[in-house]
Amino acid sequence: RTHQGYLIASLHPPIERYLVFSKINESLSVFAAENTGSSDEKFHPITDTLKKGSVPAVSAVYNLETSQHKKNGETCYTQGQEYLVSFSYDGSVHYTYQAGDITLKKHICLKHGANVCAIAYEIENNGPDASLTLVPLFNFREHSASSRPEDFHFRTSLIDNSLCLIPESHPDTAILFQTSEGIFSDHTPMFDIDMQLQTEVDLETDGLDCHYCPHEVTVFLPAKSHKQISVLCSVIAADETFTDITADTAFDILKEREKYTKSLYETAGIHDDFADRLVLAADQFLCDRASTGYKTVLAGLPWFTDWGRDTMIAFTGLTLCTGRRKDAEEILLTFSKYIRHGIVPNMFPDDNAAPLYNTADASLWYFYAVWQYLQYYPDTAANAFVQENIYPHLKEIISAYKNGTDFSIYMEEDGLIHAGSGLDQITWMDVRVGDWVATPRH
Protein backbone atom coordinates (compact mmCIF):
# COMPACT_ATOMS: atom_id res chain seq x y z
CA ARG A 1 0.00 0.00 0.00
CA THR A 2 1.04 3.63 -0.22
CA HIS A 3 2.19 3.68 3.41
CA GLN A 4 4.84 1.03 2.79
CA GLY A 5 8.46 1.35 1.74
CA TYR A 6 12.00 0.69 2.88
CA LEU A 7 12.41 4.22 4.25
CA ILE A 8 9.63 6.64 5.14
CA ALA A 9 11.46 9.61 6.60
CA SER A 10 9.96 12.04 9.09
CA LEU A 11 11.38 15.47 8.28
CA HIS A 12 9.93 17.03 11.44
CA PRO A 13 9.30 14.16 13.88
CA PRO A 14 6.78 12.71 14.04
CA ILE A 15 5.17 14.53 11.10
CA GLU A 16 6.02 15.41 7.49
CA ARG A 17 6.45 11.73 6.62
CA TYR A 18 7.76 11.13 3.11
CA LEU A 19 8.38 7.91 1.24
CA VAL A 20 11.93 8.35 -0.07
CA PHE A 21 13.24 4.81 -0.66
CA SER A 22 10.56 2.50 -1.99
CA LYS A 23 12.50 -0.73 -2.42
CA ILE A 24 15.47 -2.25 -4.19
CA ASN A 25 15.23 -4.86 -6.94
CA GLU A 26 17.92 -7.51 -7.32
CA SER A 27 18.86 -9.79 -10.18
CA LEU A 28 21.69 -12.30 -10.54
CA SER A 29 23.48 -13.03 -13.82
CA VAL A 30 25.63 -16.13 -14.24
CA PHE A 31 28.29 -15.70 -16.91
CA ALA A 32 29.14 -18.15 -19.66
CA ALA A 33 32.24 -20.32 -19.39
CA GLU A 34 34.27 -18.27 -21.89
CA ASN A 35 34.38 -15.35 -19.44
CA THR A 36 37.56 -16.49 -17.70
CA GLY A 37 40.77 -14.79 -16.74
CA SER A 38 42.72 -13.55 -13.73
CA SER A 39 41.57 -14.73 -10.30
CA ASP A 40 42.22 -11.19 -9.05
CA GLU A 41 38.88 -9.40 -9.22
CA LYS A 42 40.50 -6.05 -10.10
CA PHE A 43 42.08 -7.50 -13.25
CA HIS A 44 39.34 -9.93 -14.20
CA PRO A 45 38.09 -9.38 -17.78
CA ILE A 46 34.48 -9.28 -16.58
CA THR A 47 35.30 -6.40 -14.24
CA ASP A 48 36.78 -4.48 -17.15
CA THR A 49 33.76 -5.29 -19.33
CA LEU A 50 31.32 -4.10 -16.67
CA LYS A 51 33.25 -0.85 -16.20
CA LYS A 52 32.88 -0.18 -19.92
CA GLY A 53 29.13 -0.59 -19.60
CA SER A 54 29.03 -3.79 -21.63
CA VAL A 55 27.35 -7.05 -20.66
CA PRO A 56 29.37 -10.30 -20.87
CA ALA A 57 27.76 -13.43 -22.26
CA VAL A 58 25.47 -14.99 -19.67
CA SER A 59 24.17 -18.51 -19.21
CA ALA A 60 21.40 -17.73 -16.70
CA VAL A 61 19.58 -14.75 -15.18
CA TYR A 62 17.63 -14.89 -11.91
CA ASN A 63 15.27 -11.98 -11.28
CA LEU A 64 14.59 -11.75 -7.54
CA GLU A 65 12.07 -8.92 -7.88
CA THR A 66 8.57 -9.60 -6.59
CA SER A 67 6.08 -6.96 -7.68
CA GLN A 68 2.74 -6.32 -9.32
CA HIS A 69 2.17 -3.92 -12.21
CA LYS A 70 -0.68 -2.85 -14.45
CA LYS A 71 0.22 -3.06 -18.16
CA ASN A 72 -2.19 -2.63 -21.05
CA GLY A 73 -5.11 -3.13 -18.70
CA GLU A 74 -3.75 -6.41 -17.38
CA THR A 75 -2.17 -7.20 -14.01
CA CYS A 76 1.36 -8.58 -14.40
CA TYR A 77 3.62 -10.15 -11.81
CA THR A 78 7.33 -10.78 -11.36
CA GLN A 79 8.00 -14.05 -9.57
CA GLY A 80 11.10 -13.45 -7.46
CA GLN A 81 9.43 -15.26 -4.55
CA GLU A 82 10.12 -18.53 -6.39
CA TYR A 83 13.76 -18.23 -5.27
CA LEU A 84 12.88 -17.28 -1.68
CA VAL A 85 13.67 -20.11 0.76
CA SER A 86 13.25 -18.33 4.10
CA PHE A 87 12.01 -15.13 5.73
CA SER A 88 12.21 -13.95 9.34
CA TYR A 89 11.74 -10.80 11.40
CA ASP A 90 13.43 -10.00 14.69
CA GLY A 91 13.48 -6.22 14.57
CA SER A 92 15.31 -6.55 11.27
CA VAL A 93 14.00 -8.26 8.14
CA HIS A 94 15.87 -11.29 6.78
CA TYR A 95 15.45 -12.94 3.37
CA THR A 96 17.35 -15.92 1.98
CA TYR A 97 17.27 -16.65 -1.76
CA GLN A 98 18.68 -19.64 -3.62
CA ALA A 99 19.32 -19.01 -7.31
CA GLY A 100 21.22 -21.84 -8.93
CA ASP A 101 24.57 -22.10 -7.17
CA ILE A 102 24.22 -18.69 -5.53
CA THR A 103 22.86 -18.14 -2.01
CA LEU A 104 21.90 -14.54 -1.30
CA LYS A 105 20.98 -13.36 2.19
CA LYS A 106 19.44 -9.92 2.47
CA HIS A 107 19.06 -8.16 5.82
CA ILE A 108 17.09 -4.89 6.09
CA CYS A 109 16.95 -2.67 9.16
CA LEU A 110 16.48 0.96 10.15
CA LYS A 111 19.05 2.86 12.19
CA HIS A 112 17.41 3.73 15.50
CA GLY A 113 16.74 7.43 15.90
CA ALA A 114 17.79 8.35 12.36
CA ASN A 115 16.34 8.44 8.85
CA VAL A 116 18.63 5.67 7.63
CA CYS A 117 17.80 2.35 5.98
CA ALA A 118 20.56 -0.27 5.90
CA ILE A 119 20.65 -3.31 3.63
CA ALA A 120 23.33 -5.91 4.29
CA TYR A 121 23.92 -8.57 1.64
CA GLU A 122 25.75 -11.84 2.23
CA ILE A 123 26.37 -13.73 -1.00
CA GLU A 124 27.86 -17.20 -1.41
CA ASN A 125 28.67 -17.99 -5.04
CA ASN A 126 29.41 -21.70 -5.36
CA GLY A 127 29.23 -21.60 -9.14
CA PRO A 128 30.98 -19.75 -11.99
CA ASP A 129 31.55 -16.00 -12.25
CA ALA A 130 28.38 -13.99 -11.79
CA SER A 131 27.12 -10.49 -11.00
CA LEU A 132 24.49 -8.89 -8.80
CA THR A 133 22.51 -5.97 -10.21
CA LEU A 134 20.76 -3.62 -7.78
CA VAL A 135 18.07 -1.20 -8.93
CA PRO A 136 17.03 1.22 -6.15
CA LEU A 137 13.58 2.78 -6.47
CA PHE A 138 13.31 6.31 -5.07
CA ASN A 139 10.42 8.63 -4.40
CA PHE A 140 9.61 11.81 -2.55
CA ARG A 141 5.95 11.90 -1.77
CA GLU A 142 3.69 12.26 1.24
CA HIS A 143 3.36 8.77 2.65
CA SER A 144 -0.32 8.29 1.86
CA ALA A 145 -0.23 9.77 -1.66
CA SER A 146 0.94 8.27 -4.97
CA SER A 147 3.29 9.46 -7.70
CA ARG A 148 3.43 9.84 -11.47
CA PRO A 149 6.55 10.40 -13.64
CA GLU A 150 5.88 14.13 -13.92
CA ASP A 151 6.05 14.44 -10.12
CA PHE A 152 9.78 13.72 -9.93
CA HIS A 153 12.06 16.75 -9.97
CA PHE A 154 15.50 16.01 -8.51
CA ARG A 155 18.95 17.51 -8.75
CA THR A 156 21.13 14.43 -9.05
CA SER A 157 24.85 13.97 -8.46
CA LEU A 158 26.99 10.83 -8.42
CA ILE A 159 30.35 10.82 -6.66
CA ASP A 160 32.15 7.47 -6.52
CA ASN A 161 29.66 5.12 -4.88
CA SER A 162 27.39 7.85 -3.48
CA LEU A 163 24.27 8.96 -5.32
CA CYS A 164 22.65 12.17 -4.06
CA LEU A 165 19.11 13.25 -4.96
CA ILE A 166 17.85 16.69 -3.91
CA PRO A 167 14.11 17.23 -4.48
CA GLU A 168 13.34 20.65 -5.93
CA SER A 169 10.36 20.96 -3.59
CA HIS A 170 12.67 20.58 -0.55
CA PRO A 171 16.08 21.96 -1.62
CA ASP A 172 17.38 21.75 1.96
CA THR A 173 16.87 17.96 2.03
CA ALA A 174 18.90 15.26 0.29
CA ILE A 175 18.44 11.54 -0.28
CA LEU A 176 21.82 9.83 -0.10
CA PHE A 177 22.23 6.32 -1.54
CA GLN A 178 25.56 4.56 -0.99
CA THR A 179 27.05 1.15 -1.72
CA SER A 180 30.26 -0.37 -0.40
CA GLU A 181 31.21 -1.46 -3.93
CA GLY A 182 29.83 -1.81 -7.43
CA ILE A 183 29.66 0.03 -10.72
CA PHE A 184 26.94 2.66 -11.16
CA SER A 185 25.35 3.02 -14.60
CA ASP A 186 22.23 4.60 -16.07
CA HIS A 187 19.11 2.52 -15.70
CA THR A 188 16.52 2.21 -18.45
CA PRO A 189 13.68 2.96 -18.07
CA MET A 190 14.15 5.78 -15.59
CA PHE A 191 10.70 5.27 -14.04
CA ASP A 192 9.01 2.22 -12.60
CA ILE A 193 5.53 3.03 -13.87
CA ASP A 194 2.16 1.68 -12.71
CA MET A 195 3.28 -0.46 -9.83
CA GLN A 196 0.01 -1.78 -8.46
CA LEU A 197 -0.57 -1.83 -4.71
CA GLN A 198 -3.04 -4.60 -4.01
CA THR A 199 -4.33 -3.32 -0.67
CA GLU A 200 -5.18 0.01 -2.30
CA VAL A 201 -6.96 -1.89 -5.08
CA ASP A 202 -8.94 -3.76 -2.42
CA LEU A 203 -9.99 -0.35 -1.10
CA GLU A 204 -11.47 0.37 -4.54
CA THR A 205 -8.82 2.72 -5.90
CA ASP A 206 -6.61 2.11 -8.93
CA GLY A 207 -3.71 1.53 -6.52
CA LEU A 208 -1.12 2.69 -9.05
CA ASP A 209 2.19 4.25 -8.07
CA CYS A 210 5.41 5.26 -9.80
CA HIS A 211 9.04 5.32 -8.63
CA TYR A 212 12.25 6.95 -9.82
CA CYS A 213 15.16 4.66 -10.73
CA PRO A 214 17.86 6.64 -12.57
CA HIS A 215 20.75 4.27 -11.84
CA GLU A 216 21.59 0.64 -11.27
CA VAL A 217 24.59 -0.86 -9.50
CA THR A 218 26.44 -3.96 -10.71
CA VAL A 219 28.63 -5.98 -8.35
CA PHE A 220 30.95 -8.70 -9.67
CA LEU A 221 30.73 -12.07 -7.89
CA PRO A 222 33.80 -14.20 -8.72
CA ALA A 223 33.43 -17.95 -8.93
CA LYS A 224 33.59 -19.82 -5.61
CA SER A 225 33.54 -16.61 -3.59
CA HIS A 226 31.83 -15.08 -0.57
CA LYS A 227 30.93 -11.39 -0.41
CA GLN A 228 29.41 -8.91 1.99
CA ILE A 229 27.90 -5.78 0.45
CA SER A 230 26.59 -2.75 2.34
CA VAL A 231 23.86 -0.47 1.02
CA LEU A 232 22.67 2.63 2.88
CA CYS A 233 19.91 5.09 2.06
CA SER A 234 19.76 8.18 4.28
CA VAL A 235 17.92 11.47 4.43
CA ILE A 236 20.33 14.27 5.34
CA ALA A 237 20.59 18.04 5.11
CA ALA A 238 21.48 19.08 1.57
CA ASP A 239 24.63 20.84 2.77
CA GLU A 240 25.72 17.95 5.00
CA THR A 241 28.98 16.14 4.27
CA PHE A 242 28.52 12.64 2.91
CA THR A 243 29.10 9.95 5.50
CA ASP A 244 31.73 7.28 4.92
CA ILE A 245 29.95 3.98 4.36
CA THR A 246 33.05 2.08 5.48
CA ALA A 247 32.90 3.82 8.87
CA ASP A 248 29.31 2.78 9.58
CA THR A 249 28.39 -0.14 7.34
CA ALA A 250 25.03 -1.82 6.97
CA PHE A 251 26.44 -4.70 9.00
CA ASP A 252 27.37 -2.31 11.82
CA ILE A 253 23.84 -0.90 11.84
CA LEU A 254 22.44 -4.44 11.78
CA LYS A 255 24.47 -5.31 14.89
CA GLU A 256 23.32 -2.10 16.60
CA ARG A 257 19.74 -3.09 15.86
CA GLU A 258 20.29 -6.57 17.32
CA LYS A 259 21.67 -5.04 20.52
CA TYR A 260 18.77 -2.59 20.71
CA THR A 261 16.20 -5.36 20.27
CA LYS A 262 17.90 -7.45 22.95
CA SER A 263 17.79 -4.45 25.31
CA LEU A 264 14.02 -4.15 24.75
CA TYR A 265 13.53 -7.76 25.84
CA GLU A 266 15.77 -7.32 28.87
CA THR A 267 14.01 -4.12 29.93
CA ALA A 268 10.59 -5.75 29.63
CA GLY A 269 11.79 -8.72 31.67
CA ILE A 270 9.29 -11.09 30.07
CA HIS A 271 10.92 -14.29 28.88
CA ASP A 272 8.24 -15.56 26.57
CA ASP A 273 8.34 -15.91 22.79
CA PHE A 274 4.91 -14.38 22.21
CA ALA A 275 5.46 -11.58 24.72
CA ASP A 276 8.78 -10.74 23.06
CA ARG A 277 6.94 -10.20 19.80
CA LEU A 278 4.53 -7.84 21.53
CA VAL A 279 7.45 -5.94 23.09
CA LEU A 280 9.03 -5.60 19.66
CA ALA A 281 5.75 -4.45 18.10
CA ALA A 282 5.17 -1.92 20.90
CA ASP A 283 8.49 -0.26 20.15
CA GLN A 284 7.32 0.66 16.65
CA PHE A 285 4.65 3.00 18.03
CA LEU A 286 6.99 5.10 20.20
CA CYS A 287 8.81 8.02 18.64
CA ASP A 288 10.24 11.45 19.31
CA ARG A 289 8.25 14.67 19.09
CA ALA A 290 10.48 17.52 17.99
CA SER A 291 8.18 20.21 19.40
CA THR A 292 8.60 18.96 22.98
CA GLY A 293 11.87 17.04 22.85
CA TYR A 294 10.08 14.10 24.47
CA LYS A 295 8.61 10.79 23.41
CA THR A 296 5.09 10.38 22.05
CA VAL A 297 2.94 7.60 20.62
CA LEU A 298 1.97 7.17 16.98
CA ALA A 299 -1.29 5.60 18.09
CA GLY A 300 -2.91 6.12 14.70
CA LEU A 301 -0.06 4.68 12.62
CA PRO A 302 0.08 4.72 9.64
CA TRP A 303 -2.80 7.12 8.94
CA PHE A 304 -2.45 9.49 11.89
CA THR A 305 0.15 10.68 14.35
CA ASP A 306 -0.25 11.13 18.11
CA TRP A 307 -3.90 11.30 19.19
CA GLY A 308 -4.60 12.03 22.84
CA ARG A 309 -7.32 9.47 23.47
CA ASP A 310 -5.57 6.67 21.57
CA THR A 311 -2.23 7.43 23.20
CA MET A 312 -3.61 7.26 26.73
CA ILE A 313 -5.46 4.01 26.01
CA ALA A 314 -2.27 2.46 24.61
CA PHE A 315 -0.02 4.04 27.26
CA THR A 316 -0.04 1.16 29.77
CA GLY A 317 0.66 -1.62 27.29
CA LEU A 318 3.30 0.24 25.29
CA THR A 319 5.36 1.63 28.15
CA LEU A 320 4.47 0.31 31.61
CA CYS A 321 4.08 -3.36 30.70
CA THR A 322 7.36 -3.18 28.80
CA GLY A 323 9.34 -1.49 31.57
CA ARG A 324 9.90 1.76 29.69
CA ARG A 325 9.56 4.13 32.62
CA LYS A 326 11.42 7.09 31.13
CA ASP A 327 9.38 6.89 27.94
CA ALA A 328 6.17 6.78 29.99
CA GLU A 329 7.19 9.95 31.82
CA GLU A 330 8.09 11.71 28.58
CA ILE A 331 4.73 10.87 27.02
CA LEU A 332 2.91 12.35 30.01
CA LEU A 333 5.10 15.45 29.71
CA THR A 334 4.50 15.76 25.95
CA PHE A 335 0.73 15.97 26.39
CA SER A 336 0.92 18.11 29.53
CA LYS A 337 2.66 20.82 27.49
CA TYR A 338 -0.31 21.08 25.13
CA ILE A 339 -3.21 21.02 27.61
CA ARG A 340 -5.45 24.00 26.84
CA HIS A 341 -8.48 25.07 28.89
CA GLY A 342 -8.22 21.78 30.73
CA ILE A 343 -8.39 19.66 27.57
CA VAL A 344 -5.71 17.23 26.43
CA PRO A 345 -5.28 17.47 22.62
CA ASN A 346 -7.47 15.24 20.53
CA MET A 347 -4.83 15.09 17.81
CA PHE A 348 -1.73 16.68 16.36
CA PRO A 349 -2.27 17.29 12.62
CA ASP A 350 0.23 15.89 10.13
CA ASP A 351 1.08 19.35 8.76
CA ASN A 352 2.66 20.99 11.83
CA ALA A 353 -0.53 22.96 12.52
CA ALA A 354 -1.82 23.64 16.03
CA PRO A 355 -3.39 20.68 17.89
CA LEU A 356 -7.12 20.07 17.75
CA TYR A 357 -9.02 19.85 21.03
CA ASN A 358 -12.40 18.38 20.09
CA THR A 359 -12.39 15.55 22.64
CA ALA A 360 -14.35 14.99 25.83
CA ASP A 361 -12.49 11.94 27.07
CA ALA A 362 -8.77 12.43 26.31
CA SER A 363 -8.33 14.38 29.55
CA LEU A 364 -10.08 11.63 31.50
CA TRP A 365 -7.88 8.98 29.91
CA TYR A 366 -4.90 11.15 30.88
CA PHE A 367 -5.91 10.76 34.53
CA TYR A 368 -6.09 7.01 34.05
CA ALA A 369 -2.60 6.93 32.47
CA VAL A 370 -1.13 8.88 35.40
CA TRP A 371 -2.83 6.53 37.86
CA GLN A 372 -1.47 3.50 36.03
CA TYR A 373 2.02 5.00 36.09
CA LEU A 374 1.81 5.36 39.87
CA GLN A 375 0.53 1.79 40.23
CA TYR A 376 3.49 0.39 38.30
CA TYR A 377 6.03 2.62 40.08
CA PRO A 378 4.87 3.14 43.70
CA ASP A 379 8.06 4.89 44.77
CA THR A 380 9.20 8.30 45.94
CA ALA A 381 10.67 9.25 42.56
CA ALA A 382 7.37 8.59 40.75
CA ASN A 383 5.40 10.58 43.31
CA ALA A 384 7.85 13.46 43.00
CA PHE A 385 7.64 13.37 39.19
CA VAL A 386 3.85 13.60 39.26
CA GLN A 387 3.79 16.21 42.03
CA GLU A 388 6.21 18.52 40.23
CA ASN A 389 5.26 18.03 36.59
CA ILE A 390 1.78 16.57 36.27
CA TYR A 391 -0.32 17.45 39.31
CA PRO A 392 -0.82 21.14 38.39
CA HIS A 393 -2.26 20.04 35.05
CA LEU A 394 -4.58 17.53 36.72
CA LYS A 395 -5.96 20.33 38.88
CA GLU A 396 -6.43 22.47 35.78
CA ILE A 397 -8.43 19.68 34.12
CA ILE A 398 -10.66 19.18 37.17
CA SER A 399 -11.36 22.90 37.42
CA ALA A 400 -12.17 23.19 33.71
CA TYR A 401 -14.49 20.19 33.70
CA LYS A 402 -16.22 21.38 36.85
CA ASN A 403 -16.72 24.99 35.83
CA GLY A 404 -17.05 24.51 32.07
CA THR A 405 -14.71 24.70 29.10
CA ASP A 406 -14.70 24.41 25.30
CA PHE A 407 -17.10 22.19 23.33
CA SER A 408 -19.84 22.52 25.97
CA ILE A 409 -17.89 20.39 28.43
CA TYR A 410 -19.01 20.99 32.03
CA MET A 411 -20.24 19.15 35.12
CA GLU A 412 -24.00 18.86 35.63
CA GLU A 413 -25.64 19.23 39.05
CA ASP A 414 -25.71 15.45 39.42
CA GLY A 415 -21.92 15.27 38.99
CA LEU A 416 -22.01 13.78 35.49
CA ILE A 417 -20.10 15.43 32.66
CA HIS A 418 -22.00 17.11 29.85
CA ALA A 419 -20.10 17.28 26.55
CA GLY A 420 -20.77 18.52 23.03
CA SER A 421 -23.51 20.32 21.17
CA GLY A 422 -24.44 21.19 17.62
CA LEU A 423 -21.79 19.99 15.18
CA ASP A 424 -19.20 19.08 17.81
CA GLN A 425 -17.33 15.79 17.32
CA ILE A 426 -16.02 15.00 20.78
CA THR A 427 -15.83 11.19 21.00
CA TRP A 428 -14.03 8.51 19.04
CA MET A 429 -17.13 8.23 16.81
CA ASP A 430 -16.29 11.50 15.10
CA VAL A 431 -17.50 11.15 11.52
CA ARG A 432 -18.91 14.37 10.14
CA VAL A 433 -19.90 15.09 6.55
CA GLY A 434 -20.50 18.79 6.01
CA ASP A 435 -23.16 19.82 8.50
CA TRP A 436 -24.17 16.25 9.28
CA VAL A 437 -22.69 14.51 12.32
CA ALA A 438 -23.16 10.80 11.63
CA THR A 439 -23.06 9.55 15.23
CA PRO A 440 -23.38 12.48 17.64
CA ARG A 441 -22.38 11.62 21.19
CA HIS A 442 -23.56 14.74 23.03
Please tell me what each predicted stretch does.
Residues D244-L264, I270, F274-A281, G323-K337, ...:
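Extended, well-ordered alpha-helical scaffold segments
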Residues F315-L318, Y366, V370:
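Hydrophobic core/packing positions within alpha-helical solenoid repeats
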Residues R1-T267, P302, R309, L320, ...:
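Terminal accessory carbohydrate-recognition/targeting modules of carbohydrate-active enzymes
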Residues T78-D90, S185-M195, E266-C287, R325-K337, ...:
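An acidic intrinsically disordered interaction segment
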Residues K295-P302:
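Active-site flanking loop/helix segments enriched in acidic
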Residues D194-E216, S230, A237-D239, G342-W365, ...:
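The feature captures the catalytic groove of carbohydrate-active enzymes
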Residues H271-L278, Q284-T292, F304-W307, T334-F367, ...:
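Aromatic-lined, polymer-binding surfaces characteristic
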Residues P302-Y338:
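Alpha-helical support elements that line or immediately flank enzyme active sites
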